Amino acid sequence: MFKVAIIGDSASVSGFASLGLYVFCETEPQKVSKLIKKLAVNNFAVIYITEPVASLVQDTINKYKNSQLPSIVLIPAIRGNTGEGMRAVHEAVEKAVGSDILKN
């Protein structure tokens, strides 16, 4: 059975445990990179990661960009957001349907 994880600072991710996600409160780049690799080989289909933490481990995230699993999805944190998560959603939508239907 596939699992869903979330990685980020405690204030941003701890509430997701009540939704059944595996919560990992981690912000140190080396530990986050190791964690992503570990989750990838342990049946985690989706890994949500806060934008500020994702910016620290972009090389690791890029290794999984063309992989079927896991799907790594950037989400906003309580603070320190870059807008990268939303840009990624816009790019995916544009690639899928041929135009950015989410554009304001």
Predicted regions and their residues:
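Short secondary-structure boundary segments
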Residues: E28, T50-P52, P76
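C-terminal structural segments of small proteins and small subunits
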Residues: N66-N104
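Extended, charged amphipathic alpha-helical "stalk" segments
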Residues: K37, N62-K63
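N-terminal intrinsically disordered, cationic/polar leader segments
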Residues: S10, S14-G15, V41, I49-E51
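N-terminal first-folded block
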Residues: M1-S33
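Short, charged, surface-exposed secondary-structure boundary motifs
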Residues: S33-K38, T82-G85
